[in-house]
Amino acid sequence: MNTQPLRVGIGGPVGSGKTALTLALCQALRDRYNLAVVTNDIYTQEDAQFLVRNEALAPERIIGVETGGCPHTAIREDASINLEAVEQLNRRFPGLDLIIVESGGDNLSATFSPELSDLTIYVIDVSAGDKLPRKGGPGICKSDLLVINKIDLAPMVGASLEVMDRDARKMRGERPFVFSNQKVGQGLEEIISFIEKQGMLSAA
């Protein structure tokens, strides 16, 4: 049994699909692992309420943090509000295997504090254009896993997945990335496999 849960940080711009991915991960992993979630919103608990409404987990396993300012600060420079939520979940559910920390919508420069997150997943979406990977920034270049989401929209926005693939390889070097469409679960198994392997999770 893990003494401390694996903490997976999910970041990315507003509307990229972070909450949809968090929901999909909860639904896929909740029967395998002792799991909880912390969400970040600036002035509301909208993402937490979305997860509760969609029965991602039991409501008491989801804590919504209102950051009241720049979402970047709450996951990086002053992560205390998130660290307290993580500690609260640890006290509430001894023996947690995994805590997902979903950041508020942020910009390309946002990163998670190492104090808060053991693994980081950064989600971007195709509708922002195929130039996004080459814009770089810590989320795109340094996250443990980059998820390029909403690939079904590529034809509608004139985005080339080949260009995104090439640029992601160039910007990330050896770091992995996944193309996904969370509406139909495409790419989800690869993301889960990455979390389990890199986080050394073993199902009960």
UniProtKB/Swiss-Prot annotation:
Its main location: cytoplasm. CDD domains: UreG (cd05540). Transmembrane segments: none annotated. GO terms for cellular component: cytoplasm. InterPro entries: CobW/HypB/UreG_nucleotide-bd, P-loop_NTPase, UreG. Keywords: Chaperone, Cytoplasm, GTP-binding, Nickel insertion, Nucleotide-binding. GO terms for molecular function: GTP binding; GTPase activity; nickel cation binding. GTP binds at G12, P13, V14, G15, S16, G17, K18, T19. It is found in: Cytoplasm. Signal peptide: none annotated. The keyword Nucleus does not apply. The keyword Cytoplasm applies. Pfam families: cobW. SUPFAM superfamilies: P-loop containing nucleoside triphosphate hydrolases. GO terms for biological process: urea catabolic process. Belongs to the SIMIBI class G3E GTPase family. UreG subfamily. Facilitates the functional incorporation of the urease nickel metallocenter. This process requires GTP hydrolysis, probably effectuated by UreG. PANTHER family: UREASE ACCESSORY PROTEIN G. HAMAP family: UreG. Homodimer. UreD, UreF and UreG form a complex that acts as a GTP-hydrolysis-dependent molecular chaperone, activating the urease apoprotein by helping to assemble the nickel containing metallocenter of UreC. The UreE protein probably delivers the nickel. This is Urease accessory protein UreG. It comes from Stutzerimonas stutzeri (strain A1501) (Pseudomonas stutzeri). The lineage of its organism: Bacteria, Pseudomonadati, Pseudomonadota, Gammaproteobacteria, Pseudomonadales.
